[in-house]
Amino acid sequence: RDVVAAVTNAGGYGVLGALAYEPERLEVELDWIDDHVDGKPYGVDFAMPAKYEGQGGGDKATPEYLASLIPEEHRAFADSLMEEAGIPEMPEDFDAAPKAAGLNVDLEGPGQVEVTLAHDNVNMVINALGPPPKYVVDECHQRDVLVGGLVGSRQHAERQLAIGTDVIIAQGTEAGGHCGDISTMVLVPQVVDAVGPDVPVLAAGGIQDGRQMAAAMALGAQGVWTGSMWLLAQEADMHPEVTENLLDATSTDFIRSRAMTGKPARQYRSAWVDAWEREDAPDTLPMPIQGLLFGEYSRRWSRVHSKEFGGHPAGQIVGSIDKVRPARDMVLDMVQGWIDVAEQFG
């Protein structure tokens, strides 16, 4: 939330990733942002997948039921990784609500949207992993709130338009988190051509300075969507070992893997990611079951601040960043860089 406020106050458009928040917690976060942006608009980003285990809700969508689907083979494999690394088990009295992309979408999604739309400063709701549910689009439009959608192909963009999405975010494979396999340079013009001149397109993936923003706009985008760069903003709430890994990384250290969520997502190549690439590793599980497994074990290594296992979804652009800086400076430098390129071309 601190990054959202800092970016917004610097003249950018901050967006809060709401995946991990139950409605009650989301209310707290949005209230805080409202109190720190002086009436400026910002957005909220969800990850409501088009396909996931437990879709439709009911008894077979509960975290307890989905966790019961984790095979013993997978737990044994994860246990062996922890034992080899000397990472202890969690205390017996430890209790935490399970979190994973694609979990509790049907149960908590309506409440998350209701909370979000009750905040007047929120003027866009964005969804990843497919078009948002129809009720999200309808409720947003009833309140004059824009709907944005991340896409990784021309076909994805067409499906977003069919459901009424207002802003298309063309996210290339360089991006952090869930992404496709088409590069930003190729994808953006394809999406711009597919949606036509009346639908704004934002470019995402491999963008963190003014040169890349200028290139994206030359491809037909009307702006850029940035994510991974903010992991290294001064205001970001990151574990120190993860920040250290990101600063030391090169662009080749960020690979697409299903090890974290069950769907292809670009992330730092931690020991957990490497392990699931091994020949003796079991197949990854579908979303959100793989995410539940990851969440269970990530609590263990986070508790002891394991640098070896300290990973995070992040894009290839992080390999170009070598220091932590205030978010305001990052915004202003990007704008100045764009101006410099524009002046070069007259």
Put a short name on every predicted segment:
Residues 1-198:
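Active-site entrance/lid segments in N-terminal catalytic domains of soluble metabolic enzymes
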Residues 60-77, 181, 186-202, 208-346:
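Conserved active-site-proximal phosphate/metal-binding subdomains
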